[in-house]
C-alpha cells in the first residue's frame, strides 16, 4: 500500500507517492517519473507494482512547482493541459526534482534508478546523462534533441512500432547516437502501450514483455 510523502527540492517541497516492499526484501529504489497527466491513479498503481517486485518506488509530483496535485484525464483537454504544464516546468526543474528524490532514497542506503513514461521517459533519460542514474525510458518522445549527451549509466528504451509521436527515424537515431543503450521496439504497440487503464493505448503483450525486460535490466543495473 502506498502513502504520500514530501520531498525537499530546490523548488520547494514536492509531494510524492511512495510504496515499499511488503516483505522488506529490497532490490533497490526507483524514481518513477510520471506521464504528462500527473501522479494519477495509474501512476500510483505503477509505483505499487514495482514495490511488489521488491523495489522502494517513489513518484514525485513533477508539476508541483507549476501546479501541484495535477490529475488529468486522457482526453484532448487533459493532453493539452499536460503539455502546457510540462513546458512551463521545463526539463531543468524536472531533473532537479528527480535528483532530490534520488538523493533522499540514496540517503536511506538504496541503489537508485529512474523509470519514466512518455514525457517522463525523456526526463528519465536526462536523469541518466545528467545525474548518472540507471534509467528506463518508456516511449519518451522528447529525447532526440538531447541524444548527444553521453550516457553515465546503463540505459534502456522501450518504443512502440506504431507510435506516431516517435517515428522510425527517431528510434534509429537512438540506436546510432547512443549505441551503448538497449533499444526495444514492440510490434503492434503504439504510444502509451503500458497504460492499462486506457484501452485505446494499452497493448497487453508488449506491456508484459517490456515489464519483464525492465525488471531484468534493473536487477543488473542496481546490483
Model-found features: residue ranges?
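N-terminal cap/leader regions of alpha/beta-hydrolase-fold enzymes
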Residues: 1-223
